[in-house]
Amino acid sequence: VFSHYGPYEFMMKDENAKRMGIPVPLFNLVYHDCFILPWPMDKKQEDYMLYALLNGGISYVVRNAPYDNVDGNFGSDGLSIEDRITRANIVLDFYQRIKNEEMVEHKIINDHVQQATFSNNITIEINTKENTYTIL
């Protein structure tokens, strides 16, 4: 199944709006191996690419909302099209490694660090404070 997209609730609001809880990949723990879900790739204070990786999803190169200031469209993050393609390829390369695998485990290490492990023993760790990821 291919979907338009299914971002976390906070991705649809201004990045400075108050968040509810810690976003975790519960949906993808169940459906990752049978559902293709593109993710927003905005990079402002926080890098949304990290959530595409954590969820084992694919990326949008450019995602335009129908109107300004709605549906996650709160101005440009300043990335060039070349940077967007480079970032999309990072997500695509990871997706190629885990696309047919179940997500078998998710861990919250602390408020900013999470891990997801797939059935081929590939683990992705994201750090939303440092805006980094590691493939373990």
Identify the residue ranges that each predicted region occupies.
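Active-site-proximal substrate-binding groove within the catalytic cores of carbohydrate-active enzymes
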Residues: 1-136
